[in-house]
Swiss-Prot record:
Listed name of the protein: tRNA (cytidine(56)-2'-O)-methyltransferase
Assembly mode: Homodimer.
Keywords for this protein: Cytoplasm, Methyltransferase, S-adenosyl-L-methionine, Transferase, tRNA processing
EC number: 2.1.1.206
Molecular function terms from GO: tRNA (cytidine(56)-2'-O)-methyltransferase activity
């Protein structure tokens, strides 16, 4: 089974709460096992843990991690690191190689990332060579890697489950109990 974890860099608690939460939600929905937050924001942790509690799955969040240490540990454990940016090799040119990776850390920044990230990453991946959202970069990359498979995924232990419907909202409560 493929393991994917997201490393979020440069999160500014006063500015980036919503976008970082959405980066985590997107990674979770598209198959990541967890998110490493390289800053201190217990509000993000609480928000994402609440989603996991209500909507199921086993997604974890680690707060205030050292990005260098996490990358080092990941690589020592046999993992590869993919840094998403506007700069680097175009995603379509690397998608097949990323799909083959069994243990992948996806790094996405908020503010300008430390220059050493470009050296620490196994791949610097351009998700379009124009300014864009980190949420879009994560979504496009993870969808290309998984080829849409997580869109059919069920999340065990969910208190709430959405039932697909052509019209209206259909939610089953306490489906995980």
């Amino acid at each position: 089974m493929k393991r994917i974890v997201l490393l979020r860099l440069g999160h500014r608690p006063e500015r980036d709460k919503r976008i970082t939460t959405h980066v985590g939600l997107t990674a979770r929905m598209l198959g990541a096992e967890g998110m490493l937050l390289a800053s201190d924001d217990s509000g993000i942790v609480q928000s994402l843990e609440d989603v996991v509690r209500r909507w199921g799955g086993n997604f974890y969040i680690k707060n205030n991690v050292s990005f260098k240490q996490e990358i080092r540990n990941w690589k020592e454990g046999g993992g590869k690191v993919c840094h998403l940016s506007m700069y680097g090799v175009n995603l379509p040119d690397l998608a097949d190689e990323l799909k083959k990776c069994d243990k992948l850390m996806i790094v996405v920044g908020a503010e300008k990332v430390p220059p050493e990230i470009y050296q620490l990453a196994d791949w610097n991946v351009a998700v379009g060579s124009q300014p864009h959202s980190e949420v879009a970069a994560v979504a496009i990359t993870m969808d290309r890697i998984a080829e849409g498979e997580p869109l059919e995924k069920e999340f065990p232990g969910a208190e709430l489950t959405i039932v697909p419907a052509e019209r209206g909202k259909h939610v089953i409560e306490n489906a995980g109990e």
